[in-house]
């Protein structure tokens, strides 16, 4: 029963914790979605490849977002696969190319009309062109429901049928009803299709809105990181400003450092570089202003970016309001669909009933009348109602599809706004990371330098205390070394006395087996270890004492300096915590001492008897002291005995049957220290008091060592316990990891099972695909002949077009060069004419002014003189005035002719004001005229009939009128009008501005022509580079390579006349099936010949396994063959390939060694090598 319960609870537990790994992948632009199992994909790259194959999006252009705007990363996808903690996930897929329509978000870029242009900005034309380009290149068109096939419903055949009673019979009724039933079935299918499309398209539109919202959430998350970075910079700057020492360091420098003295007696101000700090203070002020300016600018940009995001959100909400279909609108369609079903059912039932009738029943007139009534009713009511419902549904679907397409265009515009906003915030992020961070680091560096001024009293005080501690330490170390040397010498003297006594008592007998006891090599090693060749003498001891005294004096001096410093610092403005810290540190330093042996004080009796006081001698001679030392010795011996037996390493061999001896190394080191004073413990009972005192001191030292060893052992035991606990924790953690790995292993096994199932399905699909490919290859062979013939025609056409384009290009280049030269000449001539005419105008104006003034003076004189008195002078003035008028008219004519010669016409506007405008074809009449001066291309002075300007015609009429009018007041009036019209032309610089503008237009046109010629030249070069050569191959040409055919007369033999590898159509037979493998042509024709002969001897059953050579396709050259030299297996697995020829080797088929392919004798053939450019696989 226990087993049964165990098995029964397993499925229940599995139901409690289901592992659902399905995911919904949503195309954010088309609104389509697919559901798949994430276990099918082992990595994010495989997941992207699946999406790329589904929606034809390149994997590097994929952007996948999660519902809250997080970007899907490989680590996140891997975590989803491992944890398997989700039941249903939505992945929103975007094509990065649709973000290329970058535009600034504006609140007016969405109009109230759904069909309006989504671009409403200063660059709307460019943005619209970019959108059209994206649609044209299928970046958007593939998302606009191009797969949705809409077939418009057709009217019923009953509408055009004649259902009069006289025309009704069995055959007409059955034919009409059968045809109508077919139409009814087709219409029903269409209506069901339309009805199913409505919720699908509405769901697509909602998903597009969801995709826009998720993308806006992604933008907000991205911008939030940048805003957090900005806030951290502002917070850091505020901390620097609030806690900075920019304005406080000078007070500390003057009030505090000036009152504190150093060891040398100077103030602490000498350690501060005041010039550098002042310069840094100025730099900090400038830097603070600069950082605040940058941060304020960044704040404005962030606020502007936030307004862009708000605009995007508002635009998305507007889109949602404008493009969300009203679901109540489709309630009528649902009712119509229900009535459609009822009508179709009734109409089909009536038709079936009639068709089930026998032919004899149609002879009854009553039955035919009932048929007439039924058909008339169906024709007028049922058919029209059904067709109206289908038309309504069709139009509704069309509106929804148009609505979705318009929404997609607006969505692409929104994506462009999001891309623009992200680029702006990215620039802000770079500014924060590059510039602001550097400025803040520099600001922080300056503040640290200022803070060091306030910290200098504390640091210098700590420096003095540290110096005192080091001197104290060194003085104590020297004292310890001096005392230790004396103790060591005492130990050595005692040991020498003990050894001499032992040798004296037992040496004569023990020399037989222990000669090493008679030597003193261990003392030599001890001296070498201690770096003393001999025991120290009195001079060295005096030097040590002097050095210790010197260090003690230095220590006292530093101590006095510290006391003085502490007194001074308490009188300054230094904070109490700093003073307390210095006092505490000084107190702890003075308590610092080195513990060392006091053997010198207790054993000077044996080394220097003169230095022992009488009280010490009395104490050493006391019996109580001797008894006390003997008691201590016994206690020490018992302790040593217990310690030795507690050490497992010193037990006899075999007592403890184990190979594990803990702390073996430590016990060895302890034993060595323990028996350091063994010779002292073995002294006889009647040892002298001095030796007893030495032994006591040695035992004290030994006890200290033993205690320290015990402490070390306890410490090691504690460390081992901690290590044991740590190992236990690691073992438990490893156990958890192993269980996790077991779970992961189970998950991977499930994944592998799913993958195996998917692999089996793919294998079946691959087999079906291979069958389909085989059938396609058969059709391809038929189509290849047609393609080749079409390609030949295209090649001929392209060759002719290329020649035409080359000629036209040369002609255009020559025309362009000639036009450039003519334009340059015209520009130079016009510039010279302008300068000359300007000078003439200035001279004419001066002469005209002088003439007027002189004429006025002469007129005054002539008023006093009667005309009869001086008629010659009057004639002279009239002749001079007439000459001046002629000269001015010639200048005006020449200027107007220059304008017309460059395509500009001087005319009047609607307000009768003079204007100069561009007129096409104006120069043709001038160019066709033969009255121009060929050297200057200027107008003949005696003929101005070519000038078409109405202004000139008016001036000409005025000029003729002046010439025809006799001298008098009327002539003066006409002259004033003539000069006024001329002045109107030159006063506003109308002539100069028009000429300069025209020459700028000519230069622009020349640049445009040059650019167009460059584009045409590039196009021609590309055509030349990509064309396939069909004859007269050269190195570098592109050629089509195909397997050759072989003509076999019988099953086992190959005729020499018909087995040639030549073809009736060039060197390739296109009807040959693709080879199983390509023949590898060796480096020499003789080897090829031997291979062909060997292949000819193969039995008929191996005929299909022969490897045929490949040759280049030649359409117009039947006498020359181009065989492929395939050394690298280029043809393996290929049906044909296009390659670029690398080498050509010429051969003549004049001998068997040079004719491996059995070509006609004397034939010319080439052996070529090529590199593959493109190919078709088998």
From Swiss-Prot:
- Residue spans making up a coiled coil are 538-572, 696-850
- Keywords, ordered alphabetically: Acetylation, Autophagy, Coiled coil, Membrane, Protein transport, Transport, Vacuole
Quote the record's miscellaneous comment: Present with 86 molecules/cell in log phase SD medium.
Please state which protein family the record places this protein in: Belongs to the ATG11 family.
Q: Function, please?
A: Involved in cytoplasm to vacuole transport (Cvt), pexophagy, mitophagy and nucleophagy. Recruits mitochondria for their selective degradation via autophagy (mitophagy) during starvation, through its interaction with ATG32. Works as scaffold proteins that recruit ATG proteins to the pre-autophagosome (PAS), the site of vesicle/autophagosome formation. Required for ATG9 anterograde transport from the mitochondria to the PAS. Also recruits the ATG19-prAPE1 complex to the PAS. Required for the Cvt vesicles completion. Plays a significant role in life span extension.
How does this protein assemble?
A: Homodimer and potential homooligomers. Interacts with ATG1 kinase. Interacts with the ATG19 cargo protein transporter. Interacts with the ATG34 cargo protein transporter. Interacts with ATG9. Interacts with ATG17. Interacts with ATG20. Interacts with ATG30. Interacts with ATG32; to recruit ATG11 to mitochondria. Interacts with ATG36. Interacts with YPT1.
**What's the protein here called?**
Autophagy-related protein 11
Gene that this polypeptide is encoded by: ATG11
């Amino acid at each position: 029963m226990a087993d049964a319960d165990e098995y029964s609870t397993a499925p229940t537990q599995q139901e409690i914790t289901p592992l659902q790994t399905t995911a919904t992948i949503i195309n954010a632009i088309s609104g389509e979605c697919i559901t798949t199992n994430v276990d099918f994909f082992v990595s994010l790259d495989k997941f992207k490849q699946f999406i790329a194959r589904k929606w034809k999006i390149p994997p590097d252009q994929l952007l996948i977002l999660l519902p809250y705007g997080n970007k899907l990363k490989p680590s996140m996808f891997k975590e989803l696969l491992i944890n398997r903690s989700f039941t249903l996930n939505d992945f929103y897929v975007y094509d990065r190319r649709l973000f290329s329509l970058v535009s600034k978000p504006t609140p007016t870029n969405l109009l109230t009309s759904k069909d309006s242009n989504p671009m409403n900005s200063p660059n709307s034309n460019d943005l619209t062109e970019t959108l059209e380009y994206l649609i044209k290149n299928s970046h958007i068109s593939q998302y606009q429901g191009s797969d949705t096939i809409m077939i418009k419903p057709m009217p019923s055949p009953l509408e055009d049928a004649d259902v009069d009673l006289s025309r009704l019979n069995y055959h007409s009724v059955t034919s009409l009803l059968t045809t109508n039933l077919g139409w009814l079935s087709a219409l029903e299918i269409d209506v069901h299709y339309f009805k199913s499309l409505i919720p699908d398209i509405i769901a697509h539109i909602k998903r597009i809105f969801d995709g826009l919202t998720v993308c806006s959430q992604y933008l907000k998350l991205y911008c939030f990181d940048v805003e957090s970075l900005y806030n951290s910079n502002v917070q850091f700057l505020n901390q620097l400003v609030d806690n900075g020492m920019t304005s406080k360091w000078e007070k500390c420098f003057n009030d505090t450092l000036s009152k504190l003295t150093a060891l040398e007696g100077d103030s602490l101000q000498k350690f501060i570089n005041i010039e550098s700090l002042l310069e840094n203070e100025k730099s900090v002020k400038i830097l603070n202003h600069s950082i605040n300016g940058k941060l304020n600018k960044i704040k404005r940009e962030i606020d502007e970016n936030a307004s862009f995001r708000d605009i995007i959100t508002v635009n998305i909400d507007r889109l949602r309001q404008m493009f969300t279909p009203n679901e109540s609108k489709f309630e009528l369609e649902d009712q119509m669909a229900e009535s459609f079903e009822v009508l179709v059912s009734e109409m089909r039932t009536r038709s079936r009933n009639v068709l089930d009738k026998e032919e004899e029943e149609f002879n009854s007139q009553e039955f035919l009348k009932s048929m007439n009534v039924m058909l008339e009713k169906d024709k007028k009511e049922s058919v029209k109602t059904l067709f109206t419902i289908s038309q309504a549904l069709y139009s509704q679907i069309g509106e929804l599809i148009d609505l979705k397409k318009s929404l997609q265009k607006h969505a692409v515009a929104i994506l462009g706004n999001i891309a623009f906003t992200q680029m702006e915030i990215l620039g802000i992020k770079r500014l924060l990371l590059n510039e602001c961070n550097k400025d803040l680091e520099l600001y922080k560096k300056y503040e640290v330098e200022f803070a060091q001024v306030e910290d200098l009293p504390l640091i210098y005080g700590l420096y003095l205390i540290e110096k005192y501690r080091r001197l104290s330490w060194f003085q104590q170390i020297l004292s310890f070394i001096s005392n230790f040397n004396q103790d060591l010498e005492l130990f050595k003297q005692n040991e020498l006395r003990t050894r001499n006594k032992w040798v004296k008592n037992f040496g004569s007998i023990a020399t037989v087996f222990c000669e090493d006891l008679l030597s003193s090599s261990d003392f030599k090693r001890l001296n070498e270890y201690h770096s003393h060749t001999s025991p120290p003498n009195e001079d060295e001891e005096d030097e040590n004492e002097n050095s210790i005294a010197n260090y003690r004096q230095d220590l006292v001096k530093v101590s006095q300096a510290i006391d003085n410093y502490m007194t001074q610092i308490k009188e300054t403005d230094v904070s109490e915590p700093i003073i307390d810290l210095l006092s505490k540190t000084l107190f702890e330093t003075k308590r610092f001492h080195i513990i060392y042996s006091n053997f010198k004080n207790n054993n000077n009796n044996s080394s220097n008897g003169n230095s022992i006081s009488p009280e010490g001698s009395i104490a050493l001679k006391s019996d109580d002291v001797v008894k006390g030392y003997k008691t201590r010795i016994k206690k020490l011996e018992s302790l040593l005995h217990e310690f030795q037996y507690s050490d497992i390493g010193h037990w006899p061999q075999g007592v403890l049957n184990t190979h594990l001896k803990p702390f073996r190394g430590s016990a060895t080191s302890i034993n060595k220290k323990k028996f350091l004073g063994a010779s002292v413990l073995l002294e006889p009972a009647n040892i002298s008091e001095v030796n007893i005192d030495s032994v006591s001191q040695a035992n004290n030292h030994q006890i200290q060592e033993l205690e320290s060893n015990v402490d070390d052992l306890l410490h090691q035991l504690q460390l081992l316990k901690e290590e044991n606990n740590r190992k236990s924790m690691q073992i438990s953690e490893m156990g958890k990891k192993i269980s996790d790995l077991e779970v992961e292993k189970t998950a991977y096994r499930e994944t592998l099972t799913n993958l195996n199932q998917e692999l089996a399905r793919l294998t079946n699909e691959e087999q079906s695909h291979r069958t389909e490919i085989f059938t396609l290859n058969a059709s391809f062979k038929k189509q290849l002949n047609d393609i080749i013939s079409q390609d030949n025609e295209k090649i001929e056409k392209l060759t002719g077009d290329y020649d035409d384009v080359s000629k036209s290009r040369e002609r255009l280049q020559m025309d362009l060069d000639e036009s450039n030269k003519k334009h340059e000449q015209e520009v130079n001539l016009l510039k010279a004419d302008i300068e000359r005419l300007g000078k003439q105008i200035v001279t004419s104006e001066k002469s005209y002014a002088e003439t007027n003034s002189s004429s006025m003076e002469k007129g005054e004189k002539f008023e006093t003189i009667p005309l009869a008195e001086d008629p010659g002078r009057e004639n002279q003035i009239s002749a001079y005035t007439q000459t001046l008028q002629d000269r001015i008219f010639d200048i005006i004519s020449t200027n107007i002719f220059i304008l017309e010669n460059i395509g500009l016409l001087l005319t009047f506007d609607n307000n009768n004001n003079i204007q100069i405008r561009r007129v096409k074809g104006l120069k043709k009449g001038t160019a066709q005229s033969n009255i121009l001066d060929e050297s200057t291309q200027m107008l003949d002075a005696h003929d101005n009939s070519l000038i078409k300007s109405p202004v000139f015609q008016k001036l000409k009429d005025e000029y003729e009128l002046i010439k025809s009018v006799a001298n008098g007041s009327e002539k003066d009036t006409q002259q004033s009008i003539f000069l006024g019209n001329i002045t109107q032309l030159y006063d506003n610089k109308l002539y100069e501005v028009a000429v300069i503008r025209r020459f700028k237009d000519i230069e622009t046109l020349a640049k445009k022509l040059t650019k167009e010629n460059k584009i045409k030249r590039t196009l021609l070069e590309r055509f030349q580079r990509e064309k396939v050569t069909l004859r007269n191959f050269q190195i570098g040409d592109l050629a089509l390579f195909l397997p050759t055919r072989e003509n076999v007369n019988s099953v086992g033999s190959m005729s020499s006349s018909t087995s040639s590898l030549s073809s009736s159509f060039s060197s390739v037979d296109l009807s040959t099936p693709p080879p199983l493998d390509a023949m590898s042509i060796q480096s020499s024709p003789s080897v090829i010949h031997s291979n062909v002969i060997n292949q000819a001897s193969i039995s008929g059953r191996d005929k299909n396994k022969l490897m045929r050579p490949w040759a280049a396709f030649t359409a117009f050259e039947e006498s020359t063959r181009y065989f492929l030299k395939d050394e690298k297996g280029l043809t393996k697995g290929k049906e044909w390939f296009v390659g670029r020829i690398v080498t050509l080797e010429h051969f003549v088929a004049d001998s068997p060694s040079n004719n491996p392919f059995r070509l006609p004798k004397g034939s010319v053939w080439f052996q070529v090598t090529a590199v593959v450019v493109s190919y078709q696989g088998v």
